[in-house]
């Protein structure tokens, strides 16, 4: 899965969170949240560490953050964050401004996970952003090294256990293989039916030629 972690927070207060990998991602993200300026409420940011990029969307007094593989680009992760932002505000609105930590986690972590899988496996989902003309805005977001906001003593090495990611990739591979086998089986079944009909038709033509015509008059007497 290309997007492996997501969180919705108010300042440093985490309201909902989901991780598809094990490791210390949550600890690194909390350090990032601590370093974000509380005075800025609307912005897009990107910070890289190792082979991952932290994509950040700040809007409506909340922070929407996801971590994705650095080869996945920026458009789809930000499309994911826009979708999460829309769904979160629709479900909770201003309630989130006073909610305690993890108040929405039981319900919304499932949404984070479902949309994470959808956007990771459907790279074309950023089409809407292209129509909206947001591509140029996303391109203007510079990917900064995480050291830009982290002081030397604050930085935590990002440790990600890829086992979960590999298991997830294996699951998707098996799912795609099963779908492909089903499609090939259907294709072969259709071909077999067509071939059977063709053989029956040819046999009928041969029998008809020996029996005096289409109605087989010679063979009836």
From Swiss-Prot:
Main location class: Golgi
BP GO annotations: protein transport; response to salt stress; vesicle-mediated transport
Residue ranges that the UniProt entry lists as topological domain Cytoplasmic: 2-190
Compartments (UniProt record): Golgi apparatus membrane
Pfam families associated with the record: Longin, Synaptobrevin
Coiled-coil portions: none
SMART domains: Longin
SUPFAM superfamilies membership: SNARE fusion complex, SNARE-like
Similarity comment: family membership: Belongs to the synaptobrevin family.
This protein's name: Vesicle-associated membrane protein 714
Known tissue expression: Highly expressed in leaves, stems and roots. Detected in flowers.
Gene Ontology cellular-component annotations: Golgi apparatus; Golgi membrane; vacuole
Span of domain Longin: 7-112
Modified-residue entries (N-acetylalanine), positions: 2
InterPro entries per UniProt: Longin-like_dom_sf, Longin_dom, Synaptobrevin-like, Synaptobrevin-like_transport, V_SNARE_CC
Gene that produces this protein: VAMP714
Membrane topology: Single-pass type IV membrane protein
UniProt key word 4Fe-4S: no
All ranges on the Vesicular side of the membrane: 212-221
């Amino acid at each position: 899965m290309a997007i492996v972690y997501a969180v919705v927070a108010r300042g440093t207060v985490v309201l909902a969170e989901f991780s598809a990998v094990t490791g210390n991602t949550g600890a690194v993200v909390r350090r990032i949240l601590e370093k974000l300026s509380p005075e800025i409420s609307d912005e897009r940011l990107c910070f890289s560490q190792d082979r991952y990029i932290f994509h950040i969307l700040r809007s409506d007094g909340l922070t929407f953050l996801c971590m994705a593989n650095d080869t996945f680009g920026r458009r789809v992760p930000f499309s994911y964050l826009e979708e999460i932002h829309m769904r979160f505000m629709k479900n909770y609105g201003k309630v989130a401004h006073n909610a305690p930590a993890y108040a929405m986690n039981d319900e919304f972590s499932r949404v984070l996970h479902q949309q994470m899988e959808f956007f990771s496996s459907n790279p074309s989902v950023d089409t809407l952003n292209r129509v909206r003309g947001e591509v140029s805005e996303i391109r203007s977001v510079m990917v900064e090294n995480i050291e830009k906001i982290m002081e030397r003593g604050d930085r935590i090495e990002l440790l990600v256990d890829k086992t979960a990611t590999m298991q997830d990739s294996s699951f998707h591979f098996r799912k795609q293989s099963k779908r492909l086998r089903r499609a090939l089986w259907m294709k072969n079944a259709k071909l077999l039916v067509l071939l059977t009909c063709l053989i029956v038709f040819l046999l009928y033509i041969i029998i008809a030629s020996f029996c005096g015509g289409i109605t087989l008059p010679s063979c009836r007497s």
